[in-house]
């Protein structure tokens, strides 16, 4: 929880005074943090932390909607990373880290016009 929840909360708290009308905070979560999604053994701490980040972002969206600061969450599915390789040896994810980074970058710049307080599941496969 130290990195996946508490660090996100602390960084967000520190940045709030610098955010202006129209700002967009995008938090990265995981499909494992989505209630009702497929769960995998050995990922209890990770998945529950990602669920906590989802709830945090939903609450912040409500708290800062009057200031027109958007908070959204991208719950990522399988992306080819070292962590995925360790958790699922031999599995080939359909997306590279670079492809996902491009998606996150573009979402961050424009999606506050369309979303606030939303959790978007970004997955073309399982896990």
Predicted features along the sequence, with ranges:
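Catalytic loop of short-chain dehydrogenase/reductase
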Residues: 24-52, 57-58, 62-66, 78
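C-terminal helical subdomain
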Residues: 73, 89-127
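Hydrophobic structural elements of the Rossmann-like NAD(P)H-binding subdomain
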Residues: 26, 71-74, 84
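Short glycine-enriched, charge-decorated loop/helix-capping segments at active-site entrances
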Residues: 41-44, 87-93
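Short coil/turn segments at alpha/beta junctions that flank glycine-rich nucleotide-binding fingerprints
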Residues: 18-22, 63-69, 111
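Hydrophobic positions on the long internal alpha-helix
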Residues: 7, 11-15, 19, 56-57, ...
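Conserved Rossmann-fold SDR core element
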Residues: 54, 64-79, 114-122
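Catalytic Tyr-X3-Lys loop
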Residues: 1-10, 26, 53
């Amino acid at each position: 929880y130290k990195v996946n929840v508490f660090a996100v909360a602390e960084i967000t708290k520190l940045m709030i005074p610098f955010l202006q009308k129209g700002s967009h905070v995008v938090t990265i979560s995981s499909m494992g943090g989505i209630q009702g999604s497929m769960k995998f053994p050995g990922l209890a701490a990770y998945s529950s932390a990602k669920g906590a980040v989802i709830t945090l972002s939903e609450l912040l969206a409500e708290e800062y909607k009057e200031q027109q600061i958007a908070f959204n969450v991208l719950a990522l599915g399988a992306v080819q990373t070292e962590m995925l390789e360790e958790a699922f040896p031999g599995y080939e994810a359909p997306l590279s880290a670079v492809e996902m980074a491009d998606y996150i970058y573009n979402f961050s710049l424009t999606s506050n016009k369309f979303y606030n307080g939303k959790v978007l599941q970004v997955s073309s496969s399982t896990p």
